[in-house]
């Protein structure tokens, strides 16, 4: 039985009933992460990549008083086009549902909703983390708190490179969150494959990640797992290339804080790089969707083999 505030589309409900692998997806990338029409076309392509691999996509958002798990084309277009769509983290979920307004879900909110829907795997571009001026703003993403207490595996390209990556990893360590480098020994820096920061553990196949998820589930551990998957070589922007633009965007955003900061920085960096950072963002989320589908399939096989 599922909570009555959850509403599944037919494709996801069929997958649940047929015990097929499902990959949860966030919706903030549609409403706040990219400009139109790239946001909509990317969201559709990411879902199709997951389907082609043999899994089912479940993009999550809140609409008309329900947590929608799997979106219609109409709701996707609404998220992509409407300026009034709220960017909802965990703390906003109750308010959004009570007001019956439309909201996209951040990493934290998507993890919460995915866990409610009994979905163990979630794909995104990059997690939030500790902001660079943390000593002044104390701006630490709720994503890190959610990773510490919600058992959902998050496939990402590390944390967004606009953040303080060493401090972000320190917080994850303090919270007991495993950070796995997927076929890499260094923590990816979103637009770049390498940050120069070593990852605590490395795994090299979807089956190995699925086994880790299975062990965590057997131990009844309540935290999530970060699977850090580097951007493809062909799409990456070197640290030397992207860093000056990140610094300039930060300088321009000195008096900004809260939910509006990250969307502003991503948009401004895209402008400064003449769209190169947007192209990189699109390619890394597609790559993460491909890997996420592989892991979901391997994990479902593992679950099924235990019960036969």
From Swiss-Prot:
Necessary cofactors: Mn(2+)
Residues that, per the record, bind substrate: 87, 107, 141-143
One Gene Ontology MF term: pseudouridylate synthase activity
Name of the protein in question: Pseudouridine-5'-phosphate glycosidase
Pfam families: Indigoidine_A
Similarity comment: family membership: Belongs to the pseudouridine-5'-phosphate glycosidase family.
Keyword field contains Hydrolase: yes
EC number, as in UniProt: 4.2.1.70
Entry binding sites for Mn(2+): 139
GO cellular component term, pick one: cytoplasm
Function: Catalyzes the reversible cleavage of pseudouridine 5'-phosphate (PsiMP) to ribose 5-phosphate and uracil. Functions biologically in the cleavage direction, as part of a pseudouridine degradation pathway.
UniProt keyword terms in alphabetical order: Glycosidase, Hydrolase, Lyase, Manganese, Metal-binding
Leading EC class: lyase
Subunit structure of this chain's protein: Homotrimer.
GO biological process: nucleobase catabolic process
Positions of the catalytic residues: 26 (proton donor), 160 (nucleophile)
SUPFAM superfamilies hit by this protein: Indigoidine synthase A-like
InterPro entries noted in UniProt: Indigdn_synthA-like (IPR022830), PsuG (IPR007342)
Cofactor note: Binds 1 Mn(2+) ion per subunit.
